[in-house]
């Protein structure tokens, strides 16, 4: 088995974050990632579609984190942005939005599902996530910036969601959710933090390597791909 590749699939840049896309990408490369997804919130997008920074040997994925409280409008946003994005994230935070995201197979990741006194997930939603291939984001920035009762609540919600993810085989994605270069952490730091938060070593590794790779493979299919269930075969005797 080769050396694993590490990815951070939720990084924000100007005008959503405080650091430029080039700064975030350069630091991500320096930290040892193989790639990051620049995923600004949909209500903080630049006026023009930005040109992604280029660094040889490093992948920069085009992403978005959709923010919409109305499920019907959320589905419209998913349809609007899906085909132009490598990584499509929904910013949760209510039962209606969480359900809309987890029941839609065109969504890659649900971030920030918790609301009120709920962790944001239950058995029904966890089953929907597993059936539709929607991963749950394990977001580090809120944990790093919180203290006291707020951090205790975040860890409690995370524990509840981890139990459901394990029971129903829901994929997890480990993300920094960095709003500036000061929020970025190296892959080794993120793995260590994930284990402190309750993930097993193999779970954390899958969440920062294997699952992101599967998301990109799904959204960037190979040249022989036409549509789901159909593939062009070359160089083979078909009869």
From Swiss-Prot:
Molecular function via GO: ribonuclease P activity; RNA binding
EC number(s) on file: 3.1.26.5
The keyword Cytoplasm is assigned to this record: yes
Protein origin, superkingdom: Archaea
Assigned keywords, A-Z: Cytoplasm, Endonuclease, Hydrolase, Nuclease, tRNA processing
Enzymatic reactions: Endonucleolytic cleavage of RNA, removing 5'-extranucleotides from tRNA precursor
Localization (cell): Cytoplasm
Example GO BP: tRNA 5'-leader removal
First-tier enzyme category under EC: hydrolase
Gene Ontology CC: one annotated term: cytoplasm
Keyword Nuclease listed: yes
Subunit structure: Consists of a catalytic RNA component and at least 4-5 protein subunits.
Family: Belongs to the eukaryotic/archaeal RNase P protein component 3 family.
PANTHER family reported in the protein's UniProt record: RIBONUCLEASE P PROTEIN SUBUNIT P30, RIBONUCLEASE P SUBUNIT P30
Biological role stated in the UniProt entry: Part of ribonuclease P, a protein complex that generates mature tRNA molecules by cleaving their 5'-ends.
Full protein name: Ribonuclease P protein component 3
Organism whose genome encodes this protein: Methanosarcina acetivorans (strain ATCC 35395 / DSM 2834 / JCM 12185 / C2A)
């Amino acid at each position: 088995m080769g050396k694993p590749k590490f990815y951070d699939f939720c990084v924000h840049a100007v005008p959503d974050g405080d650091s430029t896309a080039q700064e975030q990408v350069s630091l991500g490369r320096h930290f040892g990632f193989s790639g990051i997804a620049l995923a600004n919130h949909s209500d903080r997008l630049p006026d023009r579609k930005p040109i992604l920074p280029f660094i040889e040997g490093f992948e920069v994925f085009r992403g978005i984190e959709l923010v919409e409280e109305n499920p019907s409008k959320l589905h419209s946003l998913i349809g609007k942005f899906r085909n132009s994005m490598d990584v499509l994230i929904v910013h949760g935070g209510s039962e209606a939005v969480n359900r809309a995201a987890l029941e839609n197979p065109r969504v890659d990741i649900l971030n920030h599902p918790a609301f009120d006194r709920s962790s944001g997930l239950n058995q029904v939603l966890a089953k929907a996530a597993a059936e539709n291939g929607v991963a749950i984001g394990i977001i580090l920035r809120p944990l790093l910036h919180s203290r006291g009762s707020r951090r205790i609540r975040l860890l409690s919600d995370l524990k509840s969601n981890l139990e459901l993810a394990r029971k129903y085989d829901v994929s997890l994605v480990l993300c920094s959710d960095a709003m500036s270069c000061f929020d970025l952490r190296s892959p080794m730091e993120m793995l260590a933090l994930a284990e402190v938060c309750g993930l097993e070593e193999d779970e954390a590794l899958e969440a920062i390597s294997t699952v992101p790779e599967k998301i990109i493979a799904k959204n960037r299919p190979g040249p022989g791909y036409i549509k789901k269930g159909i593939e062009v075969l070359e160089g083979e005797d078909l009869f």
